[in-house]
């Protein structure tokens, strides 16, 4: 997680939790049209109204704190079926589930991996890929998503 994303998480978590939702994670995607994407969840699921409420509250806080120096779009959504994974707790919650990982730095000449989450030990996760256990540092994971099965 970048320094900006850490700061944004600190700023955003209080208003999200005050509304009764879990802040699953955030992504700040830089580009011609930069986007701040906020993922929220709750035991009862997420509605469009919930996303609108969080967007309104977070937008007000971001206007005051002003941590982002470029123009951006704010998106608030549920994690969806291909839920993004941001923390060790997320991996622990989904032990035994299939995940796709994109690494910052390649391991064994690969940046993209897919397998079953086997274990979490501090800041390291073990994923079984093609029958072999591979260990990944959370700090080297650029993006991770659950693989939905229908």
UniProtKB/Swiss-Prot annotation:
GO terms classed as biological process: ribosomal small subunit assembly; translation
Main location: cytoplasm
Keywords associated with the record: Cytoplasm, Ribosome biogenesis
Any one annotated GO CC term: cytosol
Compartments, as annotated in UniProt: Cytoplasm
Domain of life: Bacteria
InterPro entries membership: Ribosome_maturation_RimP (IPR003728), RimP_C (IPR028998), RimP_C_sf (IPR036847), RimP_N (IPR028989), RimP_N_sf (IPR035956)
HAMAP family according to UniProt: RimP
Annotated family: Belongs to the RimP family.
Biological role: Required for maturation of 30S ribosomal subunits.
Protein name per Swiss-Prot or TrEMBL: Ribosome maturation factor RimP
Protein source organism: Yersinia pestis (strain Pestoides F)
